[in-house]
Amino acid sequence: MSYQLELSFSPVNELINSLHTFLCKSWHKRIDLGPAWTQNVHASLSPEFADQLEQTGIDLEWKLLHLLAYVSPNKNSVEDYLLWMRKLTLGELFAVLSPYVQTFPEDFGAVRDRQHRMLSEWNEVYFKHIDPGIVTALRAEAEEKTGWGEFEAYEKAAALTNGFCFEPVNGLEKLVLIPHYHFQPGNIFYSYGSLTICQYASRIEPHSEEEDEPSLHLYRLLRSLSEKSRLRILHFLRSEPRTFIEVVRHLGISKGITHDHIFNLRCAGLLNVHVVGETVSTYSLRVERIQQIEQGLFDYLGMNPSLLSIPVNEMVEPSNEC
């Protein structure tokens, strides 16, 4: 049993992702852009638009918006997509979405109109002003990774998403991976029956003026190992996948603190996250990421570990001095 894997990207995806990031308040302290990004964007909004976004939740309507962007034939530019979205009749709207979903909001036409106005204004006040290099880099990421032909769909998806293992369950026919920038280090995924769409963290980082600045990817990895409880989680998962509740019981601490520890390990790529539909079923140890820790640190230091080997008989005896 397997599924088809597709790599995709359009500017519309990042338009929606950037707004998703702004709306998802629980992630504002977790994103690589930091809380300052949210504050700066909020300061640029009109009071009316800020109030509208304050009342907008991440719900079924939002899930359908991600799907609509994927099925649209006019998504090479944000302007083309918004024009297509506005001109869709209600019948056409149902026609393009009904192969994947059977549940729709009441008064779907009004929902579409509201989403169109929201995306249009977000594009005007924020998205059209972002560094164009972000979109260019995301498009290049999708094109480059499409060429990873030597991997099976399951393994390729796990590698690109930093450990998300989309299990090949009955009914899943296609997994679409879309690189994103704003919501890093998180992934966003939705299941639509035979189709699953996952926006994954591209690991594209802002330019740093400091030559010795470690990558966020490396820093997150090393920092994730700074808590004893996180090391205990890795040890607990070393032999077989475990559910979240099993991890909580093993640690003997609260669900909230356990969730934070798992979040840090997951974003560092140290855990496999086994996904069934839209549910995380279990976690397991991502051994290949453990093996990359030493090499990642040596790469940052600009050192070749093969040139640093010291024969045992040449090692200095430890001193007894304090």
Regions found by a protein language model. Give the residues of each.
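N-terminal, charged low-complexity regulatory/assembly segments
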Residues: 1-170, 174
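C-terminal regulatory or interaction extensions
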Residues: 144-220
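Short capping segments at the starts of secondary-structure elements
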Residues: 228-231, 237-243
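Alpha-helical residues within the helix-turn-helix
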Residues: 248-249, 266-267
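Helix-turn-helix DNA-binding motif, specifically the short coil turn and the N-cap/start of the second
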Residues: 254
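Beta-hairpin "wing" of winged helix-turn-helix
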Residues: 271-277
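Conserved segment of winged-helix/HTH DNA-binding domains
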Residues: 281-312
